[in-house]
């Protein structure tokens, strides 16, 4: 399974990683991503970040589009929310430091390519879609 051409290379690589594993191994990979969510930079406080209420667990994001050729994404999610942290980490790994135009071109439902639908509730999967939608909205507002 190859990732759609409209995905930035780092995100396509993440999708490829998920395509290489099956069943419970996909959940293990998601948990690995959860453990790798980058810490917030010292200048960012959760209170200054945008909440994503569509997520079942508390999630906050910050989009820095001051350089549209190198958008910075920051996420905060509690350790007790590994699925949400995993989704945020996938977006951080796949989209941080990518050009705004490339992020805006990512299909809203790219997460279906991860093959998690049989393992994670649709409500939780919509949380990832909501994160991406908010990132895109911030980029459009910055344009």
Swiss-Prot record:
Q: Which Pfam families match?
A: SufE
Question: Cross-referenced Gene3D superfamilies, in alphabetical order?
Answer: 3.90.1010.10
SUPFAM superfamilies to which the protein is assigned, alphabetical: SufE/NifU (SSF82649)
InterPro entries in alphabetical order:
Fe-S_metab-assoc_dom
Alphabetically ordered keywords of this record: Acetylation
Q: Which residues carry this modification: N-acetylthreonine?
A: 2
Q: Which family does it belong to?
A: Belongs to the SufE family.
Q: What extra comment accompanies this record?
A: Was identified as a high-confidence drug target.
From the Swiss-Prot or TrEMBL record, give the protein name: Uncharacterized SufE-like protein Rv3284
Organism listed in the record: Mycobacterium tuberculosis (strain ATCC 25618 / H37Rv)
